[in-house]
């Protein structure tokens, strides 16, 4: 259970984030996209990393857009007032056009919103805790020290549900989303191989998480995922592999080392302490 660390890792000066050399340059590059997106609180971002296929190790040449994810701490007036800002989404492709390889997506969550999703076992939210290419603030380092608070067996139905959605997308039993289908992929390979890759990726992640309490990023089976994504497997083969992995995840859950449910009071304390310490630091640095 989290009991607070007296500000260790949180009360430090945030400007520059203590990064050096090329790490600082890469952080500045990512922050530039956040500013280009006209996010109103770039100095409140406590965690920022490149997600998507690059995070998982399944990127194929220059076919993917750039996905930037992050967490921010809102100013007190947004948290305590009437107008909140739980998340921020922006894309160079806008709301209608499908993304191309030159596009950039920025997805940011408030700390409270991210923690709420992570408590539910949301796969995207849990990736934030394991992103190896991340640039972090002292506040986020505190969360990494207590990441096990967010790792429970409640993640299993979330991962399996996301994987099933991708499987249905692959087989054509589910809508393709507001930005439309991927006709060029289906025409080339005969089915949606990107959805196939995501199906297997989610299942491998789920199995590892409930068995070992971690998610390795990039994925150890990234070469296999790339082969799936480039059409080296038939759809029937992918369905068979997915079926075996679904069963493996259920078996792993039955023997899981993870607790069955979230310690919500501990998470609430960690989140509340982080907000207070961040705001206090901002006051001190004025």
Please place each PLM-identified region on the residue numbering.
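Acidic, Ala/Val/Gly-enriched low-complexity intrinsically disordered segments
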Residues: 5-8, 12-15
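Helical scaffold of the NTase/Pol beta-like nucleotidyltransferase catalytic core
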Residues: 14, 18-50
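Active-site nucleotide-donor binding segment shared across nucleotidyl transfer reactions
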Residues: 35-83
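Structured mid-to-C-terminal alpha-helical surface segments
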Residues: 43, 153-170, 210, 214-286
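Conserved NTP/Mg2+-binding pocket subregion across the NTase superfamily
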Residues: 91-198, 203-206, 217
